[in-house]
Amino acid sequence: MGFMRKFILCFLIFFSIISIYKLIYPNPRNWYDHYRFLAQSFLQGRLDTPNLPTFYQDSLEYQGKKYLPFPPIPALVLAPIIAIRKNVTQQQVSIIIGAINAVLVFLLLKKFTIPTSALLLTVFFALGTVAFWSSVVGTTWYFAHNTALIFFLLSLIAFKNKKDFLSGLFLTFASLCRLPIFLGIVFYIFELRKQKGRLNKFIIGALLCVPIMFIYNWLRFGGIFHTGYIEVYKSYLGTAYSIFHNFGYLDIRNIPLHFFTFLFMPPLIKNGLITPSPYGMGILFITPLLLIALIPPFNKGLEKNLFRGSLAIALVDFLHYAQGWVQFGYRFLLDFLPFLLIILAIRFKPKKIYILLLVISVAANFWGVNWAIKLGW
């Protein structure tokens, strides 16, 4: 595929996806935009968020100041945009990032399969997975996932191009959006363990920016490992929302809840009406094509290492005390979705059964996104 043809195709992917995202949710509510307030604080040379609305969850008070527990990269991405265009919303940036992610998925997957399959799987990613709702809604938790995906996908593209230092650097940037992603380093280590030169370059890149989080924590709370997440966790204990038990912040007893939500959580059926469950929905119902990437056995080498990387990230996510709160789908899937997409690309064939599963996935996500908008999620 020539450069100009690739450029035109990438532009068409970007334009098509961002148009769909904008059309399906033209008037978003634009609340829970924590990162926008944090970005404004960064531009003012401060780390606290004094102007954060009082009803916004996931914040904490420390020494008379209000802070957010989240890693800083999503706010750093927003900061220059807000500096140029003061009134830009987090959701407006989110749909742009979502469309960029679709382009990056295409560029990544065509390294593992034919262009036609890569294009079909790009449509699947953008419109048939939780990436659809995540990009469209753009609230704080989803914005972190969307931003992390940019860097995670860039890391995998750089890895495939043998740019190992950049690959490690991008993985750390992704981790400074969503901390569990750093466990994806398992994949890279297994892939490069017999190539010491490449592995060393990757490790140097991966570790170079890790101190950013430690310094950020120390400047806010006086300890390099103090993120504020534990305080937020304690604020949720005993809340009336969840029908599930309140176990520990990272607790092995949380694994069944996450596993069920990820795979099997069904929709709600009441008075003959089928609606998405606010607790999430399993990929069995809304993203069935992805099941192909989860069927063992995994071929020795790349497939097995991709699954190992997915498992390492998923394990930390599955230990978390909450399954993702109010959501369509299972948002934590986005932390390890790039690995599963590559496995899917390796196995995917443009046959009727695969196309049918793709169409079902896209239709289910259009249904779910429309309901989520209607329900005010």
Regions found by a protein language model. Name each.
Residues 1-377:
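Membrane-proximal envelope and lipid/glycan-remodeling enzymes
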